[in-house]
Regions:
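A short, aliphatic-rich beta-strand micro-motif
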Residues: 147-154
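Short, small/polar residue-rich loop motifs at catalytic or cofactor-binding pockets
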Residues: 19-20, 84-87, 145-147
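N-terminal amphipathic/basic-hydrophobic helices that include classical n-h-c signal peptides
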Residues: 1-16
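Structured interaction and signal-relay segments at domain junctions
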Residues: 79-142
Length: 196
């Protein structure tokens, strides 16, 4: 997979694999070492689940597996409910990308990468609740909105993503209702992933 340059088309996406010139051998236990440059670029950390499948051309393909992505239909609906009840734009993300949004232009945020500051926050399993004079955190790369409330989605002891309510022009601080909504949503998605 990593050694050749090939255009692959599927019904969902068209993408081009770049030639990296890296060839790896499988050891006697069936392990393959993924080079550090690729792990860094693709944000593959120790413990990151990878989906392995083969193509008809004889390729072995590794793809990052997102448990949050498995429940994206529910995530869309839940984001809509959170927006209607909480009155603030809402996004739900896995550890890398936004997978659901409501109250904000979906084209603006869907599939965008999460910021390194959000990555660090959810990696530490911390929640964020902004006060009127609190620190501003931009959770999505390239989007000029700040997190008002953020809670990590945890399932089976692993952090899988986050539920985030974003600031808009009228709302800059979080109240108890918003905290409860975000925490309940994060717990709900954690339970959903444990049951899948």
């Amino acid at each position: 997979m990593f050694a050749g340059s090939k255009t692959v088309s599927s019904e969902r996406n068209d993408y081009i694999m770049k030639a990296t010139g890296i060839v790896r051998r499988i050891d006697d236990l069936g392990r393959v070492v993924i080079p550090k440059e690729i792990r860094r670029t693709m944000r593959i950390r120790e413990g990151t689940p990878l989906e392995i499948y083969t193509s008809v051309d004889g390729e072995v393909i590794f793809r990052k597996y997102s448990p949050v992505g498995e429940i994206s239909g529910t995530a869309d609906q839940y984001a809509d409910v959170l927006y209607k009840v909480g009155g603030m734009p809402t996004v739900i993300c896995d550890r890398d990308h936004v997978i659901a949004a409501s109250g904000i232009q979906k084209k603006e945020v869907l599939e965008r990468r999460v910021s390194s500051s959000l990555e660090d926050l959810i990696e530490q399993r911390k929640s964020l609740y902004r006060t009127a004079d609190g620190i501003k955190m931009n959770p999505i790369e390239g989007v000029d909105r700040f997190a008002v409330a953020c809670a990590p989605i945890m399932a089976d002891g692993d952090v899988n993503g986050a539920v985030i309510m974003l600031s808009d022009k009228e709302n800059s601080a979080v109240d108890d209702k918003t905290k409860a909504l975000v925490e309940a949503a994060a717990m709900y998605f954690g339970k959903q992933m444990e049951d899948v």
